[in-house]
Amino acid sequence: MPNRSVENHLSVRSETTLSWAMRLKIAQDAARGLAYLHEGMDFQIIFRDFKSSNILLDEQWNAKLSDFGLARLGPSEGLTHISTAVVGTMGYAAPEYIQTGRLTSKIDVWSYGVFLYELITGRRPLDKNRPRNEQRLLEWVKPYLSDRKFQLILDPRLKGKYQLKSAQRLAVVANRCLVRNPKSRPKMSEVLEMVNRIVEASSAGPRTPEPPLNDVSLETARERKRRIIDLRSGEKFVWS
């Protein structure tokens, strides 16, 4: 692909920084791709190795899923899962799959949630070059999910050029994908609907950076209360 993979552009060595609008579009394209694999055909395909290096960008910066080497057909009618040897990439694999080898489409949903935090933070899911307490992305972001601290996890390479509300809402979607119980995770078609709403709201909103969280002069009390409730409802779904 002309513009390589998402992983390439999230790397600190990359000369190109993906804008926030581009990251939202990538999240949307990737969700659409997974939803099609899971629900758009007469048979189901489980990607099984969904990660940023397998999401390629074409000349128009549209995201395309690639490398289906580990993909498997979903369970036959009447079955809930497939039992397989555990394969995939550390940092993206769902905990129940690692523990049992039981394969369902919900492992892709988990991996997608990890990927959303990768887009938000610009960090790899597992990076042993960082300090010990920052090596695992999901563990590192946990203390910052509250309203006041959220900005601290946003990719510094964005240099403040992002829409804070859309980033917070994307994190809520990620949290719903990262529910410990796979049956409680949404289907990818439902995830796509959530991401579509975020993209639509972002397109209608301002392109400039939003004010700090402690500056409430530009939002009503009702809007602020709704935003806090949205974040807290998302935190209930966190993977702990």
Give the ranges of each region predicted by the language model.
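Conserved catalytic-loop aspartate of Hanks-type protein kinases
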Residues: 108
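Protein kinase catalytic-loop region centered on the HRD/HxD motif
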Residues: 32-45
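Intrinsically disordered, low-complexity cytosolic regulatory tails
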Residues: 164-169, 173, 180-240
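Activation segment of protein kinase catalytic domains, centered on the conserved DFG
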Residues: 13-28, 161
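Structural motif in protein kinase domains
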Residues: 1-13, 149
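Activation segment
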Residues: 100-105
